[in-house]
């Protein structure tokens, strides 16, 4: 079931976008809807009814439906054939439990449950994935004419039409007419019947498997049995409440993933269980599985419950989350210039369409260095994550070396009491330094900017202080947890009998708690980013107000409880008193850090803007009786008074502590001052007879790159090859700009297959000119729309099957034909240099009917020859720098626009206009830009640089600055020597 209600805060933007997009099609919309109610009646009815909107803008009334349990088991609800089929299948499951021998019940029902769980997570997941990305399920319904009235003669299966019509109208007696409902809604109704079967069989087979495995330990007492059954029943009841409350909030629309098919035109609610936990139906909504495992007292049931839960999380990450982000969390519109001049836009479009040459106006005043963001550091070279490890960075190398030492010492030393004590003491030291030492530094930074002042005193910038702090914090955190893991390993001994007592259960619980802490840490980092993770608001100006997103939507301080679940998991796994004391110390110090370091700083920055209660706290307090609420308020007062007392005590002792810390820093500073193969199936059409390749043709048009064409001959060739080539015909080689859209025009006989398609390939990738042997990798467009189930196949079609009569062939005969046009842009292009061609293929197969002329995509190198000013990038003259920077900006702007697909939402129209937000979200755009910059200027940047610079002017400034810095080490052609001539100086 979909958890789209969690994105309700973005639903207004969604409706505004849909309304704006459909405002120009009101007449067509009204015609499709049959009779849309007048505006006044529409507003009155809207309070009572729910209205849906299909992707093409059709508005319809969404009738009321009921959940699957009520439909199947409530005798008051109408029944039909599909209900009978589901009930019969469920009855067969129950019958099998009693019919099978005892030795076969467990394995058979384990296989049955895993089958239905696979149908759920893999089967339904696949269907939803292709529906979200390609509208494939609706396309199947259209292709098979499932909902086409047999009266039209287009439905080859009228019996199936009548069956589906009877099934759906029986279930929905009000506000629903099968013939008038949109195809998306009818398809969703059929889809949910399949979902009903899978979900009911999934849960039933799980319960039957638990019954087959159920039992009681032979040595279990009455008290333990009562506790086990009581806890299990509580978890099952809690699970039931979560499901019922979730269904109350999201209704059948989100329960059956309705937003994969259509959208409802109303406010999405956000309350109840959705304030308690993220994705409650997939997280806390599976508590009942563990309750049933406890009642069954079976590790087999627990194991299969964990497998099912993990599969459900995989379903969430792979299927639902991408769809939710795409549907309810679109990128915000790009910030355009306040007063963009028409000349800016015209100039940008002219540069993007054709580049005949560059002209630069001489300005006596040097161009100012573009101001970079100084309020917060640029997130370019992050520390966190395996993907950000950089062996050229001293912090990463130091951490890897220290981790290597910890691993070697842990592995090579015996687990004697002496070594165990040393490892525990080492872990205790790192925890004290991580919580107390860094806490004191942050407290001094918050009140007196101590850390920043130290670096400014020696001439460094605030960003240098920030980098050094991040390195220290990252190293301290890594060593804190590495030393704790090492101590845990030393105190751990592999059990000799896993079935003894609660040994296996302790390991399962411990592993679960460790996983919970890892998930919490990832969620915190995703919510806060690098800046928040390293307490950036202690060092830089803070935001005007706090935003609570991600895990902070439900908890104010996740680190307080679940953020330390892993250390208590280690206690369960080891069963060691020393690890218990270490975990207790860690938890206490973390709570103290939050209370005495982070909380005062946040109150000083944000004051009353701080949220008093999180979503989980609100949900729990609402469910408490009044007496407990009153007692809770008294406890809060006592804790607050105790906190004030401790703060006063620390204020009195702070001067002595500060003096001691200063001494440690001074002594430490003095000490350190001394010291792939892929299988491809090629489909060949058997019906090529009667199709003449001479009747097909493919021609192309694109944005020519004349500067790249003129640079084919350089001084690197022999003397004869340096002479300009004299052509014997009027042919001009096709050289196009990097990333510029390419228009393809094709002709074909009138009887050509509607499934024909055109793909883009590298010339060197295909040895055969008759059959294409490699896949197109998505770089293809159909010649006729709506012939393929994949919607990207139609993206790019401009003209299709336009009839042309009387074409004269080479043999003198005339013949009618059809023609079409399509455009290849964005992901349908190769984002690299090379020689390419377009191939026209027959009938959805790989038989080639026509091939375009080969064309080249090149990135022209920026040097003195493509600039009208006689200067170099490494010039020291200020006026020269101004001129060359302007030249770089103008050369870079059309390339950046091409790299951003010339999308008006993200591509800039001028050098000062900021990039769209999607550039920061989708890494392909920055990677395209840095690839082009590398070939244009010989400078290699990381993609994060493009995100951080934010516009063409900043990027051009960075390129010029990098060229100046790297000039002495450049090996490119230059007008002078790059290094001084020592002998010449001596002479």
Curated annotation (Swiss-Prot):
Transmembrane stretches, start-end: 84-104, 108-128, 194-214, 222-242, 272-292, 299-319, 394-414, 422-442, 484-504, 508-528, 561-581
GO cellular component: cortical endoplasmic reticulum; endoplasmic reticulum membrane; perinuclear endoplasmic reticulum
Root EC class: transferase
UniProt entry keywords in alphabetical sequence: Endoplasmic reticulum, Lipid biosynthesis, Lipid metabolism, Membrane, Methyltransferase, Phospholipid biosynthesis, Phospholipid metabolism, S-adenosyl-L-methionine, Transferase, Transmembrane, Transmembrane helix
Cytoplasmic side: 105-107, 215-221, 293-298, 415-421, 505-507, 582-987
Matches recorded under Pfam families: PEMT (PF04191)
Subcellular location: Endoplasmic reticulum membrane
Name this protein carries in UniProt: Phosphatidylethanolamine N-methyltransferase
Classification of source organism: Eukaryota, Fungi, Dikarya, Ascomycota, Pezizomycotina
